Amino acid sequence: MKIAVIGQSLFGQEVYCQLRKEGHEVVGVFTIPDKDGKADPLGLEAEKDGVPVFKFPRWRARGQALPEVVAKYQALGAELNVLPFCSQFIPMEVINAPRHGSIIYHPSLLPRHRGASAINWTLIHGDKKGGFTIFWADDGLDTGDLLLQKECDVLPDDTVSTLYNRFLFPEGIKGMVQAVRLIAEGTAPRRPQPEEGATYEGIQKKETAMINWDQPAEAIHNWIRGNDKVPGAWTEACGQKLTFFNSTLNTSGLVAQGEALPIPGAHRPGLVTKAGLILFGNDDRMLLVKNIQLEDGKMMPASQFFKGSASSALELTEEELATAEAVRSSWMRILPNVPEVEDSTDFFKSGAASVDVVRLVEEVKELCDGLELENEDVYMATTFGDFIQLLVRKLRGEDGESECVINYVEKAVKKLTLQMPYQLFIGGEFVDAEGAKTYSTINPTDGSVICQVSLAQVSDVDKAVAAAKEAFENGLWGKINARDRGRLLYRLADLMEQHQEELATIEALDAGAVYTLALKTHVGMSIQTFRYFAGWCDKIQGATIPINQARPNRNLTLTKKEPVGVCGIVIPWNYPLMMLSWKTAACLAAGNTVVIKPAQVTPLTALKFAELTLKAGIPKGVVNILPGSGSLVGQRLSDHPDVRKIGFTGSTEVGKHIMKSCALSNVKKVSLELGGKSPLIIFADCDLNKAVQMGMSSVFFNKGENCIAAGRLFVEDSIHDQFVQKVVEEVGKMKIGNPLDRDTNHGPQNHEAHLRKLVEYCQRGVKEGATLVCGGNQVPRPGFFFQPTVFTDVEDHMYIAKEESFGPIMIISRFADGDVDAVLSRANATEFGLASGVFTRDINKALYVSDKLQAGTVFVNTYNKTDVAAPFGGFKQSGFGKDLGEAALNEYLRIKTVTFEY
C-alpha cells in the first residue's frame, strides 16, 4: 500500500520505519521545518532512505488550503495518510484525498480527553485507565470514527513521561502498524465515537499550569504529575516562580518536620525535608515533591532548596575525562549552532528541545554501556559541566546528591587528629537518635569518657529498615551490574586502607585493642575481607539442571542466586570493625542492604566505617548503622517484618533468643556465631617450643577476647610440667600497658562489667580447687586491665572447665600418655563446637584427631590462623552458618528455580 506519513518526532520516525519493514511503500514524508538548523528525526530517517521529504511551514492560509502544497501532495498518489504525531493543521483536501482516507494516533481513550494535551488531562483527572486511540480523520477535532483502541492501568505516580515511555510510545507504534495492516486486509472497523462521556480540554501552557492550592492533596498531586515535564506545574514562593516535578502521595514513614516554605494560598506552608518538599492539600493530607525548578531554569532536588548545590566538583580520572569528551561530541552533534561546548553551555538555552533530550539520553546510554540514565537527569543538570558531574557520579555508583554533613568528635592521639562521627547513620546521613538520646562511650585504658554517642530507639530502627528497603527495592544498588558493585566494594577497601592508622587508633581507644594488633588484624583483615568479597560480586552463578522432558515438548530448568533483601547484622565488642567486615562484606557482595547494630560499648569504628561508605560512593540506604542496646535495637531488628536475614555474633543465650524472635516474626533466615569452649590438645610428640608459643596465642591473643580462644588446654602428662613452666616464663615477659604504645602486647579488657566477670570467674576456679599458677586479678592501675592468668589441675566437673571466660585465662588439664580416645572424649564433652586444635608431629594422629574433634574449625600445629577465603563457623550450641569464604555468600542469598517449556 502506498502511504504518506504526516507528522514528526521519534514516534513518527519509528512508525515510518515499521511500516517500511511491513512492506508498505512510503511515497512521501511531510514533517515540520528544521528548527535552529536541526531536522526532525522523521525527516532525517526518510532522507536517508531516499524517500521524498516535504517541510511545509503551513498547509493553509486564512482557512484555505494552499494550492501548491496540495498539488505536491497529490502528485505522490498516496492510498492512505498515516498521522502518528502531527502538530500542524492538515486541510481536508489532503485528509480525504487517498482512497483509504487518513488515520490519526491520539494518546487517550476517545471520546475522553479530546484535544492536544490528552495525556496531561488523563493524569490531571486522576483517570485509573489510560491508553490510545487510532481513529479515522474527519473535519472535527478528534471526533472521527474509531479504528483501534488499547488501554493500560495508570499508576498512582505516573507522569506524562512515564506513561508515554511505558505504554503510549511502544504500544502506540505497534498499534499504528496493526491499524495499517487491518486497512490493507480490508478488515479495519469504523465505529462511530459515542458522545456519552466525551470531554474536550484545552492545550496546557505554562500560564495555565499554576497550582490551585484550595483542593485535596490528591488533586494537587494529579495536577503536578499531569503537567510534568511540560509545561510544569508552578506556584509563587520566596519571591520567584517555582515549578514542581516528581510528585508522590506515598508518604508513609515521613514525619511532617522540616524547614518551612511559605506558599501564598496554600493551606499550610510546605516543609523542606531530607526526602523532598512536603506539601499539604486542604484536607491536610501530605504529598511529596522531589524536584524543584527555579525561575532561572535550574533544576534541583527539593531537599536541597534552602542549601543550594553543596556538592564539591569531582576530580575525573583519565578514563572519565575520555568519556566526558565523547559526551561533548554528542552535545556538539545535537547543538549544531553552538560553536564550542563549554562547561557553562546550557543544553536548553542552546536550542535543545524535548526530542533532543531523548536523543542525548540514548546516545549517552549507548556510550556508557549499562548506565541507568533518564530524561529527568538532563533536566536536573542542564549545563555541560553539571551533566558530566552527574554522569560521573552515576558511573561511580553515587547518587549525585550534595555531600553529607558529618559532625565529628576530634581527638589528638599519637600525632593523629582523629575525626570520629558519633550520630546514627540512616539513609546516607548522620542523624540524631529519636529524642536526641545519647550515651557515653568509655576508653577502657583509663575509664574516661571518649564522647557522647547517639542512642538508637525503636523508631530509629524502623527508619533505618525503611531506608534499607527503599535502597534494595528502588535504589541504584539493585540496578547496577554485579561487577560495578564489586568496584564499589574495592573502592571501599582502598579507603579503609588509606585510613587504616586512624581506624586502628580508634579501635585502641574505644575497644582497648593493642594498636599493632589492631593494625594487622582488626583493620588489616577487615580490608582483606572486603577485597575478597568484592571479587565475588560478579561470580555468583546459578546452574542449568537436566530434568525429565514434558514430551513431546522440552524443558529447561535453571537456578538463580538472588539477594534476600534487608539484612540485620548484630556484632560483638571484641573485634568491632573485623566482625562488621566479616558479615557486611559478604552481605553487600550478594547484593543486599544492611542495618548494622555495633556493640553498644564499641560503636566508633562502625561509625567511621559509615563515613567511608559515603566516600566510596555506596548508595544511600545500602548501609545503615545504629549504636544502641540489644534489648531495643537488636530486638526490633529480629522482630521487624521487613528484615529478611539476621547475622549475629555473640553469646549463646542471646543467640537462642534472636532465633526464636526471627521464627515468630517472619521466619527470617538466621546465621549465628555463638559461644565457645575450644579445646586445644597438646601431645608429647609435639614441637614443644612452638606449642608453648601457639598455646600462649590461643589464649592471650587480643586479651583473650577472642571467640575461638582455646578455652581449655589438654596437655599430655609427660610434658605437662615443662609446658606449664615455659608458659609462666612467657607470661612474665608480657608487657601490660597502654594499647597505643607500640611495645605493648597486653591491653585493657573491653569494658568494666567484663573485667568484673573475669575476677569472679577466677575466684570461682580457686574455690572449686583449681591451682592458680599466676594472675587472677585486676592490674593495680587505672583502666580495665586484667592479669594474664594460668590455672592448672582443672578437673572436668569444674565451672572453669566448662564455661567460657572470654578473657586472658589459660585453663590447663592433664591427660594420660597415649590415651588419645580418652582426651578426645573429654574435649568433645561440651555443648560448644566453634574451634579446636592439636599439636603433634604424628600425621596419622593429627588426621585422626582432626576427624574426631566436633568443631567447625580444627587447627593442626597452629592456632588462630583464620583467612578470608576459609569458611568460619561453629557446631552445636556455637551456632550455625558461616562467615568468610564462598560459603558465607550463601548465608545472604536465596536460590530460585526457573523452569521453561518449549
Curated annotation (Swiss-Prot):
In alphabetical order, the GO MF annotations are: aldehyde dehydrogenase (NAD+) activity; formyltetrahydrofolate dehydrogenase activity
Residues with PTM N6-succinyllysine: 38, 660, 767
The protein's location, in the record's own words, is: Cytoplasm, Cytosol
- CDD domains reported in the protein's UniProt record: ALDH_F1L_FTFDH, FDH_Hydrolase_C, FMT_core_FDH_N
Q: Give the span(s) annotated as Hydrolase domain.
A: 1-310
Q: List the disulfide bonds.
A: none
Residue numbers bearing the N6-acetyllysine modification: 882
Q: Which domain of life is it from?
A: Eukaryota
Q: What happens when the gene is disrupted?
A: Homozygous knockout mice are viable, fertile, develop normally and do not display overt phenotype. However, they have metabolic signs of folate deficiency like the accumulation of formiminoglutamate. Mice show reduced hepatic folate pools with a strong accumulation of (6S)-10-formyltetrahydrofolate and a significant drop in tetrahydrofolate levels. This is associated with a strong decrease of glycine levels as well as levels of several glycine conjugates.
Task: Identify the EC number(s).
Answer: 1.5.1.6
Keyword tags: Acetylation, Cytoplasm, NADP, One-carbon metabolism, Oxidoreductase, Phosphopantetheine, Phosphoprotein
Q: Where is the Carrier domain?
A: 318-395
**Where, in this chain's numbering, is (6R)-10-formyltetrahydrofolate bound?**
88-90, 142
Amino-acid positions noted as binding NADP(+) in the UniProt annotation, renumbered to this chain:
571-573, 597-600, 630-635, 650-651, 673-674, 757, 804-806
Residues annotated as the enzyme's active site: 106 (proton donor), 673 (proton acceptor), 707 (proton donor)
Q: Which tissue types show expression of this protein?
A: Highly expressed in liver (at protein level). Also expressed in pancreas, brain and lung (at protein level).
Q: Where is this site: Essential for catalytic activity?
A: 142
Tell me the segments the record calls region Aldehyde dehydrogenase domain.
417-902
One GO CC term on file: mitochondrion
UniProt similarity note: In the N-terminal section; belongs to the GART family. In the C-terminal section; belongs to the aldehyde dehydrogenase family. ALDH1L subfamily.
Under the heading PANTHER family, the entry gives:
ALDEHYDE DEHYDROGENASE-RELATED
What does the record note on quaternary structure?
Answer: Homotetramer.
What's the domain remark here? The N-terminal hydrolase domain has an NADP-independent formyltetrahydrofolate hydrolase activity, releasing formate and tetrahydrofolate. The C-terminal aldehyde dehydrogenase domain has an NADP-dependent dehydrogenase activity. It catalyzes the oxidation of formate, released by the hydrolysis of formyltetrahydrofolate, into CO2.
This chain belongs to the protein called: Cytosolic 10-formyltetrahydrofolate dehydrogenase
| Organism of derivation | Mus musculus
Gene this protein is translated from: Aldh1l1
